[in-house]
Amino acid sequence: MSQPKRYEAGVKEYRETYWEPTYVPKDSDFLAVFKIVPQPGVPREESAAAVAAESSTATWTTVWTDLLTDLYYYKGRAYAIEDVPGDDEAFYAFIAYPMGLFEEGSVVNVFTSLVGNVFGFKAVRSLRLEDVRIPLWFVTTCPGPPHGIYVERDKLNKYGRPLLGCTIKPKLGLSAKNYGRAVYECLRGGLDFTKDDENVNSQPFMRWRDRFLFCQEAIEKAQAETGERKGHYMNVTGPTMEEIYKRAEFAKEIGTPIIMIDYLTVGWAATQSLSKWCRDNGMLLHVHRAMHAVIDRNPKHGINFRVLAKIMRLIGGDHLHSGTVVGKLEGDRAATLGWIDLMRDRYVKADRSRGIFFDQDWGQMPGMFPVASGGIHVWHMPALVSIFGDDSVLQFGGGTIGHPWGNAAGACANRVALEACVKARNEGLPIEKMGREILTEAAKSCPELKVAMETWKEVKFDFDTVDKLDVQHR
């Protein structure tokens, strides 16, 4: 006698289950927008549904265990499709995920689904996560920045202007003593911070403990001479979590105010763990985004940096590198302005002109300082102040240490240029348009600035941006 049929076995099209164009997203849903280039001959609705399925509940065939759960509740839903301006191959797919799919406070769990195996799925030729809407209920379960912008300003007693920093160069090869000397010269010249570069860990030429001690000596000497709070981002990145904590504890023990982590190479869970430690121990946390361009630069495959910025705000950093627009590194101006808003503001409205697809409510979560770093010098100062505003960190590496008169002179030139631009802005002047006049006037009483302007007057990085906003192709 044949057994009664309990379910329909076999393979069926994803769109039968995961394409719901009538679905109205809930406030509690995670929303994602993917840029999809489907395989030839695969309909858009099928590709969108396949991404929704593979990033939520589905496997490649119907399984009887679907009957043991509420598949209708737990599945991801592709609910809308849009054309990508200027790209006939690609389209946007909007997908909603129910709150029950994810562990509270675990960014790792959320993105293991959203950008996990689905990115190797054969049904699509390329796939890019362009934006996500993090529901407020999930935001409130995440730690966020250890301290945030306002607490950091109070700790440093610095207000009304961007903070000024410098990455020590050469990034590799200096002894700890010479490295500390470079830190001291920069700080006494007028900078607020100096910084380890991302790949300065504990190499044979300079072990981490020696570097920390010489840098802290430089900080204390510069503070005593200038009367200002100073700091150096001591990179605690290491091969194990135990080693990271060991370095962080030592930095705290010697009295440094801020440490640094390379959050993509050490991982999100490690960064969130260190962020919690920083909050508990009163340490500021500077976050470097080394490796981000591997993930976000290809305009058709990967993860847009605005998503990485949201992730970092959730897991918790006080500073995050954001690009410069005007320097040597990739950065579309409109997109960068959108990233800055997402790092700092409590509520960000959807704005396609800045690449922001969804409203984002951060509740009471503190904001992060966006960090402009990479190929910038005094001539860029008017644009940087205009783009980034006061709540930012402007870091000039070669643009400080490359000064013909040395580090202290380079730091002095940048500090004078910064204060001249802030003063002009506060007086209502259009500082980007009048930048040359503002800097030239300031240089009359600052020979260090005059020499810096002469040194870098011809230096430009005129390369086209690879990852442009799609709206610019219209």
UniProtKB/Swiss-Prot annotation:
Q: Which cofactor does it need?
A: Mg(2+)
The UniProt keyword set, sorted, is: Calvin cycle, Carbon dioxide fixation, Lyase, Magnesium, Metal-binding, Monooxygenase, Oxidoreductase
Write one Gene Ontology MF term: monooxygenase activity
Task: Give the enzyme class.
Answer: lyase
The EC number(s) given in the record are 4.1.1.39
- Say which domain of life the source belongs to: Bacteria
Asked if the keyword Metal-binding belongs to this entry, the reply reads: yes
Please tell me where Mg(2+) binds in this chain. K195, D197, E198
GO BP, one annotated term: reductive pentose-phosphate cycle
- From the UniProt record, list the reaction(s) this protein catalyses: 2 (2R)-3-phosphoglycerate + 2 H(+) = D-ribulose 1,5-bisphosphate + CO2 + H2O; D-ribulose 1,5-bisphosphate + O2 = 2-phosphoglycolate + (2R)-3-phosphoglycerate + 2 H(+)
**Similarity section:** Belongs to the RuBisCO large chain family. Type I subfamily.
- Subunit text: Heterohexadecamer of 8 large chains and 8 small chains.
Relay the record's extra comment: The basic functional RuBisCO is composed of a large chain homodimer in a 'head-to-tail' conformation. In form I RuBisCO this homodimer is arranged in a barrel-like tetramer with the small subunits forming a tetrameric 'cap' on each end of the 'barrel'.
Q: What is this protein called?
A: Ribulose bisphosphate carboxylase large chain
Q: Which organism is it from?
A: Hydrogenophilus thermoluteolus
